């Protein structure tokens, strides 16, 4: 069952050359990237005592905005994307900056099924795919027994519709118009339900919010719009139900 949404691929292919232009269509990702990296590294280093040999998989890596900086810090990173043009952009940037990343044009379905990773990352991707439950199950299917996954996406709330679409796309122009489809936003509770019959549970939810007074992005307990989700194996204790 494919997760590919051809219309989404067509949208991103048109701008795939522009991933590293901080003033271009992906400018907002550059602005939140320091916070994303900080969160990911904090989760990894708090989960693992020894990070020297960890294998990381970045799914839907785009132009490599996460994969390349992680690899530059010494992590062993494999990064995949369905678009060859994204992989070419990511590979070129990494090579020009002397960073080694294993970039592959692939979908999660095409990836070697028995290859497992210590950390699976998927940022701002699941709101752009088809068959989202199977996509998420495929993601967590590549986690090692003691591994973890970090996902980020947008909540399906009225607040997210106003801020994530009307304001971000049409008022401030942070992202191109029609980048997002509100119906494809996911509530954390829906992901919780998708994982009910697996051995994976939600370990943490953390919001990412914009502070207009300081003109900066920061982590928050407010998950009404953008949020991170950290996943791992279920423990013996009862998994807290996610209802939001």
Curated annotation (Swiss-Prot):
The keyword Secreted does not apply. One of its GO terms (biological process) is methylation. It holds the Pfam family Methyltransf_11. Gene3D superfamilies: Vaccinia Virus protein VP39. GO terms for molecular function: 2-polyprenyl-6-hydroxyphenol methylase activity; 3-demethylubiquinol 3-O-methyltransferase activity; polyprenyldihydroxybenzoate methyltransferase activity. Pathway: Cofactor biosynthesis; ubiquinone biosynthesis. CDD domains: AdoMet_MTases. Keywords: Methyltransferase, S-adenosyl-L-methionine, Transferase, Ubiquinone biosynthesis. Its EC number is 2.1.1.222, 2.1.1.64. S-adenosyl-L-methionine binds at residues 36, 60, 81, 123. It catalyses: a 3-demethylubiquinol + S-adenosyl-L-methionine = a ubiquinol + S-adenosyl-L-homocysteine + H(+); a 3-(all-trans-polyprenyl)benzene-1,2-diol + S-adenosyl-L-methionine = a 2-methoxy-6-(all-trans-polyprenyl)phenol + S-adenosyl-L-homocysteine + H(+). O-methyltransferase that catalyzes the 2 O-methylation steps in the ubiquinone biosynthetic pathway. PANTHER family: METHYLTRANSFERASE, UBIQUINONE BIOSYNTHESIS O-METHYLTRANSFERASE, MITOCHONDRIAL. Belongs to the methyltransferase superfamily. UbiG/COQ3 family. This is Ubiquinone biosynthesis O-methyltransferase. It comes from Rickettsia felis (strain ATCC VR-1525 / URRWXCal2) (Rickettsia azadi).
